[in-house]
Amino acid sequence: MTLALRYKRVLLKVSGEALMGEQSFGIDVSVADRIASDIAEVRKMGVEVAIVIGGGNIFRGVAVASHGGDRVTGDHMGMLATAINSLALRTSLTKLGVETVVLSAITMPQICESFSQRKAMSYMNQGKVVIFAGGTGNPFFTTDSAATLRAAEIGADVLLKGTQVDGIYSADPKINSTAKRFDQLTHVEILRLGLSIMDTTAVTLARENNIPIIVYSIHEKGGLTKVLNGTGRFTVVSE
């Protein structure tokens, strides 16, 4: 059985930094378009797709706290950054004819709909791509935690994390050339080894809800399809 058949509904986590491309800030529209093209390709395979995007290309809440500011306000600013990125990716998907809706954990009715689990499930059952903005809607939680939470809420078969590298390493391979790459890990091993691919809350939530995680490079065109076909280069996290 192929991974495409095993994974009918997926939650894709995309970092905000992935949208920057070669820029140092903001959104590279050509990168957003390429990511959207990969998503459109897997939709044609019949895979239901939901997405959570980070906001680090625009703002990080911890930046405020590190300079003596209020962390809660900083995190709220970060949530708004995820909304900007979500609208950008929706625009790229819409250009390809992919019906897409943005649901936000923080209310902004003039811009997008508010999140509810029932609404998200309804849209996914209609074949629409659903993008979750605003993180969890609460400060002190990362968008990785938001992605795991939404994956649990919609009953996703797997959490796919598109990153800057092709899997999970013992250290940043761009800095440490001797970093060990893992093909397979358990949630417990990630926690025990202190691997920084996701925060502890996200990994624990995935483990408690039996959600496997696949980590792959978001930068390879067609990489998402390869992952779902089981032919790509990635790391699988499961019990």
Curated annotation (Swiss-Prot):
PANTHER family for the chain: URIDYLATE KINASE (PTHR42833), URIDYLATE KINASE PUMPKIN, CHLOROPLASTIC (PTHR42833:SF4)
Annotated protein name in UniProt: Uridylate kinase
The protein's Enzyme Commission number: 2.7.4.22
Stated regulation of activity: Inhibited by UTP.
Catalytic activity line of the entry: UMP + ATP = UDP + ADP
Residues that bind ATP: 13-16, 56, 60, 163-164, 169, 172
Domain of life: Bacteria
Compartments, as annotated in UniProt: Cytoplasm
GO molecular function: ATP binding; UMP kinase activity
Keywords: ATP-binding, Cytoplasm, Kinase, Nucleotide-binding, Pyrimidine biosynthesis, Transferase
